[in-house]
């Protein structure tokens, strides 16, 4: 089932320096909660400055949904320490509140009013809040409070030059973009390994079903928790953050221009379903527009091609201008066993897997095959640890035992690990391979199995509160290592100044500005 990458691995072993200079970054979301686990109703902590313009700490959907962002970094340890500093400072500056350590929220009542993230009075800030109003009206606020970790990854130019020859200009844009689309296609085919190993949302609180019927065979504990005994990541299931209305868009990952055209079409395609919501009611705007996507960011995807945007530029226009610059992996649940929601083992595994995805052959993928890959993902998401689980290839009927496929993949990853260790020194990547491959013979070692044992004992709420309290105490006591207190104060002041400048520079009324951007 795994493509034959022996030639590509032999090539890599002859060109180890092609992997010197991998760049990566992390984003981690987490809900602010009270000591009893209920959602915090306070505004964004003052010490964290402006959520609109702060470089490292912002908000996602809700005012209580923090998002931490590291700068691009070539050093894993430095990046994780930077992320930990962001958590340390925040833990010391959020009063008695804690950071919820799980992807799935709990203690949110059905119909509870969840305050949308607020970004001030600039047109850009009001647009961001209106976009969230649209998300709430389309999908419900509860779904938008699910948290995850995003891992951003780019291969060094040395890799592309070793692989594609001496490239520059338009030629580089085309070839590098084609290389990253290969990564994306392989990710759709084999990325289910991420929720298998690291999925950590095998259960949900009863409030999450919101009284809706479900065909999933949930088991229920006495405290009202619903779980699937072999599930890995309900966050990635249809119960979590997915968008059924997007499944017919036909966006593919074979070619830069084809992908961008599909994305641009989606933000122009009217939706009958969303038209029923209306655009405005009683003088209040309900969504940016009633198209399938309000803006490009609404496209749900487990992985995205990205380029840093310039001021006023859409993500797709940035891709057209310069091609794909990096990949955003979006399938990681919050790691409940880490105070910062992600750890070194996961980052090193993702490095290995992304390199493998760049090496393995990846035939073009039709929208039909893309839909077929979802079958494997759903199996792993809902019953990944089931003893006799099998997976298929695309739309073919042949089936293969998941443990065997996993071990075959890790045989390749071990060779990538040897190459990365040869240029970085030590055996850190090989150690990760040895630790994780054991999960295929013993699923009890996976994150989902480990966290489910705790949840069955103490419930999602009890588990979440215990971790949140322990991490709050730990982070508040730890000294900062990379950033200093004055760095945070300076960024708070600078972010507030940037927001004020944006607000002062706006001359058009929001309604007029919106007509040009909706």
Swiss-Prot record:
> In which domain of life is the source organism classified?
Bacteria
Keywords, alphabetical: ATP-binding, Glutathione biosynthesis, Ligase, Nucleotide-binding
Q: Does the keyword Metal-binding apply?
A: no
Q: Enzyme class, one word?
A: ligase
Note the SUPFAM superfamilies from the entry.
Glutamine synthetase/guanido kinase (SSF55931)
Q: What pairs make up the disulfide bonds?
A: none
| InterPro entries reported for this sequence | Gln_synth/guanido_kin_cat_dom (IPR014746), Glu_cys_ligase (IPR007370), Glut_cys_ligase (IPR006334)
User: What are the recorded Gene Ontology BP terms?
Assistant: glutathione biosynthetic process
Which Gene Ontology cellular component terms are annotated?
A: cytosol
Which chemical reaction does it catalyze? L-cysteine + L-glutamate + ATP = gamma-L-glutamyl-L-cysteine + ADP + phosphate + H(+)
GO molecular-function terms, A-Z: ATP binding; glutamate-cysteine ligase activity; metal ion binding
Named in its record, the pathway it takes part in is: Sulfur metabolism; glutathione biosynthesis; glutathione from L-cysteine and L-glutamate: step 1/2
- The EC designation for this entry is 6.3.2.2
What the record says about family reads: Belongs to the glutamate--cysteine ligase type 1 family. Type 1 subfamily.
Name under which the protein is recorded: Glutamate--cysteine ligase
Q: Which organism is it from?
A: Escherichia coli O17:K52:H18 (strain UMN026 / ExPEC)
The beginning of the lineage is: Bacteria, Pseudomonadati, Pseudomonadota, Gammaproteobacteria, Enterobacterales
Q: Which gene encodes it?
A: gshA
């Amino acid at each position: 089932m795994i493509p034959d990458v022996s030639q590509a691995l032999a090539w890599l072993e002859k060109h180890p320096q092609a992997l010197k200079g991998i760049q990566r970054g992390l984003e981690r979301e987490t809900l602010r909660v009270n000591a009893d686990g209920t959602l915090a109703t306070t505004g964004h902590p003052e010490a964290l400055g402006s959520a609109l313009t702060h470089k490292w700490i912002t908000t996602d959907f809700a005012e209580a949904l923090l998002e931490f962002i590291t700068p691009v970094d070539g050093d894993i340890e430095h990046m994780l320490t930077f992320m930990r500093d962001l958590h340390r400072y925040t833990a010391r500056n959020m009063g008695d509140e804690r950071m919820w350590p799980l992807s799935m929220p709990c203690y949110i009542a059905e119909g509870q009013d969840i305050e949308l993230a607020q970004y001030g009075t600039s047109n850009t800030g009001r647009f961001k809040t209106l976009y969230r109003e649209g998300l709430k009206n389309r999908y419900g606020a509860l779904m938008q409070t699910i948290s995850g970790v995003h891992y951003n990854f780019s291969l060094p130019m040395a890799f592309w030059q070793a692989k594609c020859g001496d490239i520059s200009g338009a030629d580089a844009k085309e070839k590098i973009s084609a290389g990253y689309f290969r990564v994306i296609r392989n990710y759709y085919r084999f990325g289910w390994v991420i929720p298998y190993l690291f999925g950590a949302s095998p259960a949900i609180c009863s409030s999450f079903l919101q009284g809706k019927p479900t065909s999933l065979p949930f088991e229920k504990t006495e405290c009202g928790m619903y779980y699937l005994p072999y599930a890995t990541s309900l966050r990635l299931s249809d119960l979590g953050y997915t968008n059924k209305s997007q499944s017919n868009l036909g966006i593919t990952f074979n070619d830069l221009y084809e992908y961008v055209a599909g994305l641009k079409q989606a933000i122009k395609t009217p939706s009958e379903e969303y038209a029923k919501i209306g655009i405005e009611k009683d003088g209040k705007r309900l969504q940016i527009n009633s198209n399938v996507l309000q803006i490009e960011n609404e496209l749900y995807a487990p992985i995205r091609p990205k380029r840093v945007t310039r001021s006023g530029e859409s993500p797709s226009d940035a891709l057209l201008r310069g091609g794909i610059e990096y990949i955003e992996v979006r399938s990681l649940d919050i790691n409940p066993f880490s105070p910062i929601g992600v750890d070194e083992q996961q980052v090193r595994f993702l490095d290995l897997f992304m390199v493998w995805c760049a090496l393995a052959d990846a035939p073009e993928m039709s929208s039909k095959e893309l839909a077929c890959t979802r079958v494997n993902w759903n199996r792993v998401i809902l019953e990944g640890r089931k003893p006799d689980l099998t997976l298929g290839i695309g739309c073919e009927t042949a089936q293969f035992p998941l443990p065997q496929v996993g071990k075959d993949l890790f045989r390749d990853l071990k060779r990538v690990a040897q190459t990365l260790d040869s240029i970085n020194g030590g055996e850190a990547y090989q150690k990760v391979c040895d630790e994780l491959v054991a999960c295929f013979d013993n699923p009890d070692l996976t994150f989902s199995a480990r966290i489910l044992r705790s949840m069955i004992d103490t419930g999602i709420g009890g588990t979440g509160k215990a971790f949140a309290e322990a991490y709050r105490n730990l982070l508040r006591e730890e000294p900062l290592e990379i950033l200093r207190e004055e760095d945070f104060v300076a960024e708070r002041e600078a972010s507030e100044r940037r927001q004020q400048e944006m607000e002062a520079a706006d001359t058009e009324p929001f309604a007029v500005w919106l007509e040009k951007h909706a």
